[in-house]
Amino acid sequence: MLLWLTEILSQYFSSLTVFQYLTLRAILGILTALLISLVIGPVMIRKLSQYQIGQAVRDDGPQTHLSKAGTPTMGGALILVAIAISTLLWADLTNRYVWVVLLVTLLFGAIGWVDDYRKVVERNPRGLPARWKYFWQSVIGATAAIVLYVTASMPQETSLYLPFLKNVSLTLGPVLFILLTYFVIVGSSNAVNLTDGLDGLAIMPTVMVAGALAIFAYLSGHAQFANYLLIPHLPGTGELIIFCGALVGAGLGFLWFNTYPAQVFMGDVGALALGAALGTVAVIVRQEIVLFIMGGVFVMETISVILQVASFRLTGRRIFRMAPLHHHFELKGWPEPRVIVRFWVVTVVLVLIGLASLKIR
């Protein structure tokens, strides 16, 4: 929106051409989203407390979690508001990638909002039934996949690139592309949701991965950088640095209130949306495998749940003391802050490995 305005006004005030630069708009996007989160956050927390929109805690979970009962939840709405406003202000709104990512994020957030609303307002412990949750996730994920395939104009937009290998890619037909995109978006959404069980555990890795994806988006959209680094050149993806920057700013602002001991939880409205956002950006910049690496914490949490359920159904025994994985470490006696920070450290290492794929071929 402001880009369009500055383009018009730059005819009269040449200094406004500085707003054409992606890097400046990305920085402003980060700061705008951060400011919105910090300003609106206290107001939202008070309102959530006033209307008793608090977190319910399972009796069979770690006993240390019982003190969290009643903590305001659905705070992920704050993140989505900050991301949406900042993106609409600073991104090029004629860019199709911006709209695809933003709409997928908000629609997954809507699914999470309904789930949270039924749990905490209607006092329905099941929330949105799983079959309906996955149905709507599938509809949105598949629709996004079809849109991206139909609007693709170059082969590299629908190819799978293997990191750490020089000029190695797999051409995907419509079926494989749509299936891969669907699984990345829906899988990423649910993986982040499973990780969101401790104060700040999900949001900081999300911020770090989003920051790394912003780098991939910028480099992929720049012909010279992309050719030098042997990554696919995808015109237009550079604008996603604005969205990723807004996510980083909004996430850091939310972490201000979500850090241990949390004043607010993001709920499904935030976790499902942020996971879908990461998956969609990774698909657009053709870094699905790198997302799998950088989001290793999310992957481990998801695999722990799958293994736990499979083991119990097949043998009647559990592999972990409790799943997802972070609860296993809690029940082993690790204090919550230790679990959180160590998972953050793991994410830092994995993100650096993912970024190393830019140069190691």
Swiss-Prot record:
Catalytic activities: UDP-N-acetyl-alpha-D-muramoyl-L-alanyl-gamma-D-glutamyl-meso-2,6-diaminopimeloyl-D-alanyl-D-alanine + di-trans,octa-cis-undecaprenyl phosphate = di-trans,octa-cis-undecaprenyl diphospho-N-acetyl-alpha-D-muramoyl-L-alanyl-D-glutamyl-meso-2,6-diaminopimeloyl-D-alanyl-D-alanine + UMP
Localisation per UniProt entry: Cell inner membrane
EC identifiers of the protein: 2.7.8.13
Keywords for this protein: Cell cycle, Cell division, Cell inner membrane, Cell membrane, Cell shape, Cell wall biogenesis/degradation, Magnesium, Membrane, Metal-binding, Peptidoglycan synthesis, Transferase, Transmembrane, Transmembrane helix
Topology within the bilayer: Multi-pass membrane protein
EC class: transferase
Any one GO molecular function term: UDP-N-acetylmuramoyl-L-alanyl-D-glutamyl-meso-2,6-diaminopimelyl-D-alanyl-D-alanine:undecaprenyl-phosphate transferase activity
Pathways per UniProt: Cell wall biogenesis; peptidoglycan biosynthesis
GO cellular component: plasma membrane
Function of the protein: Catalyzes the initial step of the lipid cycle reactions in the biosynthesis of the cell wall peptidoglycan: transfers peptidoglycan precursor phospho-MurNAc-pentapeptide from UDP-MurNAc-pentapeptide onto the lipid carrier undecaprenyl phosphate, yielding undecaprenyl-pyrophosphoryl-MurNAc-pentapeptide, known as lipid I.
Similarity remark: Belongs to the glycosyltransferase 4 family. MraY subfamily.
Protein name, per record: Phospho-N-acetylmuramoyl-pentapeptide-transferase
Chain's gene name: mraY
